């Protein structure tokens, strides 16, 4: 359902929006906001955010900058992740298994890749 809605917004942006000109008081425009909201949050929540934005875009509104809110991780997702960690024995992705290696390669070890790479190298 997400992609047909995104296609409708793109169709509007390519056909109707150029005829109307820049009339939106907000940045990004309502159609760009809607596209981003549906792409980021999905069809249901993105459509609700877009409808609320269009309702706010009226002659009595001052306008301004109004970005799409970031996607939040749902509470049930955090509970599921905690249960999964407890089942696996408490290891998490933040604590990688080192298998006898030091967690941070020291620059004193000449065989480590960190000793060969300059601290100002790209990607370091």
Swiss-Prot record:
InterPro entries per record: Membr_insert_effic_factor_YidD (IPR002696)
Keyword tRNA processing attributed: no
Source taxon at top rank: Bacteria
Region annotation (Disordered) ranges: 86-124
Keywords in alphabetical order: Cell membrane, Membrane
A cellular component term, taken from the record's GO annotations: plasma membrane
Pfam families noted in UniProt: YidD (PF01809)
SMART domains linked: Haemolytic
Main location: membrane
Compositional bias segments (type: Low complexity): 103-124
UniProt-annotated location(s): Cell membrane
Mode of membrane association: Peripheral membrane protein
Record function comment: Could be involved in insertion of integral membrane proteins into the membrane.
PANTHER family: MEMBRANE PROTEIN INSERTION EFFICIENCY FACTOR-RELATED
Protein family (similarity comment): Belongs to the UPF0161 family.
NCBIfam families, alphabetized: membrane protein insertion efficiency factor YidD
Protein name per the record: Putative membrane protein insertion efficiency factor
Species this chain originates from: Streptomyces coelicolor (strain ATCC BAA-471 / A3(2) / M145)
Lineage start: Bacteria, Bacillati, Actinomycetota, Actinomycetes, Kitasatosporales
């Amino acid at each position: 359902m997400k992609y047909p809605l995104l296609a409708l917004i793109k169709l509007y942006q390519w056909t109707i929006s150029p005829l109307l000109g820049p009339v939106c008081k907000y940045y990004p425009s309502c159609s760009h906001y809607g596209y981003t909201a549906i792409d980021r949050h999905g069809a249901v929540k993105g459509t609700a955010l877009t409808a609320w934005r269009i309702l706010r875009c009226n002659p009595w509104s001052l306008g301004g900058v109004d970005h799409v809110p970031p996607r939040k991780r749902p509470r049930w997702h955090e509970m599921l992740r905690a249960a999964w960690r407890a089942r696996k024995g408490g290891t998490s992705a933040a604590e990688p298994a080192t298998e006898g290696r030091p967690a941070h390669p020291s620059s004193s070890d000449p065989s480590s890749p960190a000793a060969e790479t300059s601290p100002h190298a790209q990607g370091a």
